[in-house]
Amino acid sequence: MTIQLEVCIDNLESLHYAQQGGASRIELCSSLALGGLTPSAGFMQLAAKHASIPVYAMIRPRQGDFLFSSDDVEIMLADIHAAKKAQLQGVVIGVLTQEGHIDRDILNSLMKEANGLGVTFHRAIDQCIDPMAALDNIMAAGCERILTSGLQANALDGVDMIAEMVTYCGDNLSIMAGAGVTATNAKQIITRTGIREIHLSGKSTRPSHMVQFANQAHMGSADIDDFSIPVTSVEKISAVINAIR
């Protein structure tokens, strides 16, 4: 059984590293530190140019919850259009109601705009109060997969729920495990759940290439080092590939 390995990235440098490591698919984001937000149109275009594997763009206009306003939805529709224009292979979406259910109306609107693209429903499902009803709605909308940690903080802790989802959906929806997946636990997660897809960042950092700079002014939170650049690790991705063979 071939296992698909999706790598989430938020810069073009990481795209090259993910491909070198053996990734099967890219989830294209900005701001992975915030859980992943929508990448820019320029990033989408350059990713499409340089990728030799499928690229799915995250469609998430802001950090925080998955209860989106009409303005948010308008942005999401425009961003899906941008992903199409960039000739990406798919998008990653997720929308909830105030009560913690799938927002079927918004999901159907997004799916209509995404016609012709592959669609992953992201970890918004991990904040649903009734995950099996959520799966029914996601399948009915026409999504091809979900990304989930089994409603837990990480996929290893959520293996029982993930396995239940796999059984429930059968061949109607692919279940992809993500959150905390590493070379150490990937094989165990696959064996215990029956999944055929895993998701990870394989992140590391590299130092800035700047040789002179003033370092007293922070561009964001003071606890974030502006001169340490997050990038995908070729070695970490390769290690996961080797672990699941």
Curated annotation (Swiss-Prot):
- Record-linked PANTHER family: COPPER HOMEOSTASIS PROTEIN CUTC, COPPER HOMEOSTASIS PROTEIN CUTC HOMOLOG
> What cellular component GO annotations does this protein have?
cytoplasm
- Natural source organism: Photobacterium profundum (strain SS9)
* Family as reported in the entry's similarity comment: Belongs to the CutC family.
Work out whether the entry's keyword set contains Cytoplasm: yes
- Cited Gene3D superfamilies: Copper homeostasis (CutC) domain
Compartment list: Cytoplasm
Tell me the protein's name.
PF03932 family protein CutC
**Which UniProt keywords are given for this protein, alphabetically ordered?**
Cytoplasm
Write out the GO MF terms: copper ion binding
Which SUPFAM superfamilies does this entry report, sorted A to Z?
CutC-like
Q: Does the keyword Cytoplasm apply?
A: yes
